[in-house]
């Protein structure tokens, strides 16, 4: 079984992939990067973050839309089951590249994935995605409250600084 890997090499590899894809988008004039994360990915993310003691932001899972510098990251398939996505990809004859680390139980995400498979997967995944949606709504509400407070109380100057009227909060 091997000892769990604590260096989070998967996160670093993911960050490197995102950087490469973002640079490709910028070089080719694309403003949006669409990713194929699906319903099971969202459930795994929620469980992984819960295991690590995350708060509301982490328990909201992956956002469907994330501003990331010059490129907006979109995840339009978060509510789609993996089996349906795979069937569509197969029907279209698209090539799939499988990351071998996706089956390596040294990684927390892989152990979580296997645990979901042993349970009533559909019910668990639906419940986890519902929880992520509720946390996402809480996160969005919080962000709106903060943005409105800043809009009312903060003056941004072209010189690159801002003043905050604390009494207006």
Please annotate each region the language model reported.
Residues 1-115, 120:
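Core alpha/beta nucleotide-donor-binding catalytic domains of modification enzymes
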Residues 87, 91, 126, 130, ...:
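Glycine-rich active-site loop/lid subdomains used to bind and stabilize high-energy intermediates
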Residues 2-3, 16-17, 66-70, 130-169:
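AMP-forming adenylation/ATP pyrophosphatase catalytic core
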Residues 107-110, 122-133:
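The feature marks non-catalytic terminal segments
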Residues 120-121, 153:
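Short, intrinsically disordered/low-complexity patches at protein termini
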Residues 9, 124-127, 142:
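Residue-level recognition of alpha-helical structural elements
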């Amino acid at each position: 079984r091997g000892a769990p890997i604590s260096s989070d090499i998967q996160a670093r590899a993911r960050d490197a992939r995102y950087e490469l894809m973002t640079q490709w988008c910028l070089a080719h004039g694309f403003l949006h990067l669409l990713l194929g994360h699906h319903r099971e990915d969202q459930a795994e993310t929620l469980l992984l973050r819960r295991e690590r003691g995350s708060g509301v932001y982490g328990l909201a899972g992956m956002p469907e839309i994330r501003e990331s510098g010059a490129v907006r990251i979109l995840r339009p398939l978060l509510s789609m089951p993996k089996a349906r996505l795979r069937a569509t990809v197969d029907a279209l004859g698209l090539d799939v590249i499988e990351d071998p680390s996706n089956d390596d139980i040294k990684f927390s995400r892989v152990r979580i994935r296997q645990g979901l498979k042993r349970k009533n997967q559909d019910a668990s995944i639906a419940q986890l995605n519902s929880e992520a949606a509720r946390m996402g709504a809480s996160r969005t509400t919080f962000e709106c409250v903060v943005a409105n407070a800043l809009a009312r109380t903060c003056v941004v100057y072209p010189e690159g600084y801002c003043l905050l009227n604390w009494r207006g909060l």
